[in-house]
């Protein structure tokens, strides 16, 4: 998509979208809007679970479909399959790809502000924060 304006580099922000995209219809619209917003440098889309078995996988597929339809190359990553209480996080190796990406982006040398847009459960974010304590 071509825009008739640009956003200066120092005004852009890094964004990670953490979403239970298959739970309700608003998340795919939010993903599309974020991907089309020139101010946002969307670094990753992280699939979240919701209150059904296999929900993270369904969210992953829905988010992947939105990314494909918009011809975007933003990575869609699998997140936690259960709430934090059900996760075993003895070490960083136990993190899901989504939590690892959140942690890595937060610790990167990039000086652009980082925002994590949580559109559902926050298990992936909580796991990343918990990993910093280990």
Per-segment meaning from a language model:
Residues 1-134:
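N-terminal acidic, glycine/proline-rich low-complexity segments
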